[in-house]
Amino acid sequence: MNPDNPLLALRDKISAVDKKLLTLLAERRLLAVEVAQAKLATHRPIRDVERERALLENLIVLGKAHNLDAHYITRLFQLVIEDSVLTQQALLQKNLNHPHAHAARIAFLGPKGSYSHLAARNYASRHFDSMVECGCLKFHDIIKQVENGVADYAVMPIENTSSGSINDVYDLLQQTSLSIVGELTLPIDHCVLVNGPTDLQQIETVYSHPQPFQQCSQFINRFPHWKIEYTESTAAAMEKVAALNSPKVAALGSEAGGELYQLQVLERNLANQQQNHTRFIVLARKAIEVSDQVPAKTTLIMATGQQAGALVDALLVLRQHNLIMSKLESRPINGNPWEEMFYIDVQGNLQSERMQQALQELQTMTRSLKVLGCYPSENVVPAEPGR
């Protein structure tokens, strides 16, 4: 407390309240683990959307008694519920596949501070007690680390809401024997990171991975005098700027990553789209089993015949079995000009009867068909309170 400065005194009080909130959030997460254990014993689904909706409606009523806005309460507790769902999913999956795994070696793109590094840490924090970090220079190196047994898991970006699909990763999925065992989505907030006092006009050279430059192209175009230099990762760009120690250079990357290199944020929120997220996939040498208590996603890769309507016919099989396709991506087949492979994300468990029936039908009408993996879906669509 600082009685001589009323503003500082109030901030001290706010900090004290924030600490209490953190303690309560941690306590709530522990209760979510107990709920997951109870559901494991009774084989009940992880999600109960009606219960979530009723919870939100009750909290809105309670919030009004404290003059708290309904929209504020809804947004806040949708995040809390999402954390609870993902925590419970992770516990069920660990119990089913790796009940005794406490540490994992995870390969990712770049040194510490890259977005892939942050995604790997997020995944490990939910699924393991600790993580051994295996930073790599290229996507190909990440795959090889796991294939050769140097790492247990690969965390790789697959698509971004602003710049679209990451084709290099899709192409590697054609060639690897690894299976997709998980996914996660990371909010991306690109910043201009500098080593000391400077301004945007004084900067001459900006370093980053090609993806941030694509995602922030509208902001970048405002400074035509900037020289753009590509690096293997955002973390490599931060490392470079930290080493150069010049007011004329900057990096595009995350604030959390910049802190690891003692860089300062000069500008935030650079992306063309306000909602900028990257979806990452997690790969391992062995496929996993997904509990039928958990929402699942299955990723397929297939090549259809060259006749007209072949792809449409294949997709109709999914529709006939009430399977929802959430992603369709095409990539050229190496060595076969004008021929394409199709990557399909389907909402559903590989072991379900309808998925098995659909795969049997697809097998007879495609030139090749491969399941890349079945894994828990981490896209938690928030429940909405009744109007």
Curated annotation (Swiss-Prot):
The organism's taxonomic lineage, starting at the top: Bacteria, Pseudomonadati, Pseudomonadota, Gammaproteobacteria, Enterobacterales
Main location group: cytoplasm
PANTHER family listed in its UniProt record: PREPHENATE DEHYDRATASE P PROTEIN, PREPHENATE DEHYDRATASE-RELATED
Source species: Enterobacter agglomerans (Erwinia herbicola)
Domain Prephenate dehydratase residue range list: 105-285
Entry protein name: Bifunctional chorismate mutase/prephenate dehydratase
One annotated Gene Ontology cellular component of this protein: cytoplasm
Function of the molecule: Catalyzes the Claisen rearrangement of chorismate to prephenate and the decarboxylation/dehydration of prephenate to phenylpyruvate.
Domain Chorismate mutase: residue ranges: 1-92
